[in-house]
Amino acid sequence: MLMTTTTTAMSVSLSHDVIIAAAQRAARAIPPLWPLASSVAVNPFLGQASEPLEMAAARLRRASGIAVTMPRHWYAERLQSGEITEDDLRAPLQNAPAALRPPSLSALRHAIAATRPSPQAIPTVAELARDTAAVDWPGIVNERIGHWAAGYFDQGQALWAVGRSGGAYSTWRIIATHDLTPEIAGLAGFARYVADAPANAEDAIVDCVARLGLSQDALDGYFHRLLTTLGGWGQLGRYRLWQAELSGATDACVTDLLAIRMLWEAALLGNGGCALVPGWRTAIAAYAEPVAATSDDVIDSILQEAAERAAQRKLNAVLAAPSPAQVAAGRVKLQMAFCIDVRSEVFRRALESLDSGIQTLGFAGFFGLGIGHRRFASDVVEARLPVLLAPGVITCAGDATASAAASDLSARIAARAKRAWGRFKLAAISSFAFVEATGPIYVAKLLRDGLALARQHAPNEPAPRPADGLDLETRLTMATRILKAMSFTGGFARLVVLAGHGAKVVNNPHASALHCGACGGYSGEVNARLLASLLNDSQVRAGLAARGIVIPADTLFLAALHDTTTDAVTLYTADHPSPGHAEDLAQAAQWLAAAGALARAERAARLPRAHRSQDIAHRARDWAEIRPEWALAGCQAFIAAPRSRTAGRDLAGRAFLHDYDWRYDDGFGVLELILTAPVVVASWISLQYYGSTVAPESFGAGNKLLHNVTGGIGVVEGNGGILRTGLPWQSVHDGQRLTHEPLRLSVLIEAPPEAIANILERHPQVRALFDNRWLHLFALDDEGLIRPGFRRHSRPSLRVAPFKLYRGQVAS
């Protein structure tokens, strides 16, 4: 085996710093992956936000061999049906780069009818070795790395934990030096090669760069390519870096993974000898070429934007139509604040239709409380806030009393006994006799669960509280900030319900993805209960009154949990007993039950095999149900405006609705918060659905029916290999057609355009999302219609055109 070949050393020696800087840039070109316990939607194009769609298409074609738009026939069908008009095509055609766009509308139509070339990634050494040796080296590499990574990243699923001392690279070297699988497959001397490799991951990368003969220009593209071949394992390393940086630290896991992958490459090149050299020379030259969009990339970008303009026209028509909603005279009877999640739109519309005295509000589901929460009888701190932020307050469940401490101890003992029993069931020896010895005990449970007869209960832990207590000034500042951010500083009803949301499903590894994204992949009742307690505090209310926010003495704030799978709402009445509100609570319960029935009936029409609203509750308990709900499939728009602009209008559960009134936003601090937090979170959700639809092979989690949970952190298809990311195919497709229309999010904000522009100037990373059209930005006038807004253009490799204002219509 030739492990020290220099026949491919075609470049001058590169410095350590240059190589590692390229590795770090490549690490930031891939998105992070959150573990299953707290999975949240992530923008798969996070590393490409600084460039437009056509450039991202060119880059990801080289790195992953994928297309980032739908096939041409998808757009052709919409053009033929009239859904996309010539006007929709004309504007993006005019804005496209002149050197690459079709010369005319007829030429563009001709291009739509043509078949787009299949995207091809630049090959790795493993792929070249597969083609020359007829051995599936990419599959073997993925399988062996996945086998090790499942144990290394395990979060309690494995019975035997893998040692983690020294980091990922060091741990892998120990395993790899004893793994003979590569040598059996034909990679002679691999274990010895790994043993002789540098002990430090960065040094190993530098050494492999020399062995592979990489030029400086090829580094970024090649490193990016290798990290994409790792799938979710590389993204899990990126997640560790993300989490470390939130606290001002760093993490080398993703660099370690790159070093591991490069050792495979260098070993395969040395083993392949001269047979691989010509193909590898060609690949290096391709990696070194600057990334450049092609005319096909530009055509696809034009078609994608045309589809989005068509959707924006429809949305504008809905907003312009007369609203059937009626405004109650006098004090409203019930106010209910929901998360901005698109699933809340259906329930809010249903609830408001029952009585003109009902008013709903939309706000980010963590309710402005950036908390790390410890559940009852647990020491694990759950970050129940947007993943862009770090917790500022630690909370826990239950009072600090002797009886609570005794209950806590009892619950911990029970949990340990349950874990011990679970490990006994799976142990190497006892597992064989377990079924025969204890099977009859489980008959009733199996029947109950298998027939979906088991009852499900909403989370009902003891009321949460700050772990260390908060002084009055801190509590008052929090309450003031939150109420102003909600545009909710007056007109309080007797009963104000703060509804977090979650999803109660069974046998679903991605269950946390159905919870509240703003709560970090957890359900939102903890945040809602904390805020209700804060706003019921008499001292806080007195302080708020001194600041001009007067809450009537008869106003009761109460937390609730909206189950988005069944549209059942749980009221946490025991948190704040109030006999004087018994009638209000009874009426609210009736309204919520009626609204739930209306919402279920509307959602049942979209769900396969849900012929009646009663079927929905059954689906939530069905072990075999792969589509208990559609979650956020179909999300299309984000609207920040007073509720009166959208009340009574059927937005079909496709819009994030955030209450905002700029007239009460002195200095536009709330607007800045909306643009830099909820809008960004919504963009991550939208683009995850987009990526899982247009490129399911790379940005989707594959087929739910084949999923196996590995390490408690993610899923693989089948018995192992690459960790899958994104959404399962069943989350965007009903078996016959797509249920998610892949459109980039349209952001509509009722605010002065100048204020929006000033905020974006201060936040270049957010501005880049609009400049490069990962998001579309519009401003609404005082009647809730599109008025002068933004259509920004920024093409770094081409001449930069200034952004334009447009009036009264969706225009360029």
UniProtKB/Swiss-Prot annotation:
Its main location: membrane. Its cofactor is Zn(2+). Keywords: Cell inner membrane, Cell membrane, Membrane, Metal-binding, Transport, Zinc. The keyword ATP-binding does not apply. GO terms for cellular component: plasma membrane. It is a peripheral membrane protein. GO terms for molecular function: zinc ion binding. It is found in: Cell inner membrane. InterPro entries: DabA. Zn(2+) binds at residues 339, 341, 501, 516. Belongs to the inorganic carbon transporter (TC 9.A.2) DabA family. Forms a complex with DabB. Part of an energy-coupled inorganic carbon pump. This is Probable inorganic carbon transporter subunit DabA. It comes from Xanthomonas axonopodis pv. citri (strain 306). The gene is dabA.
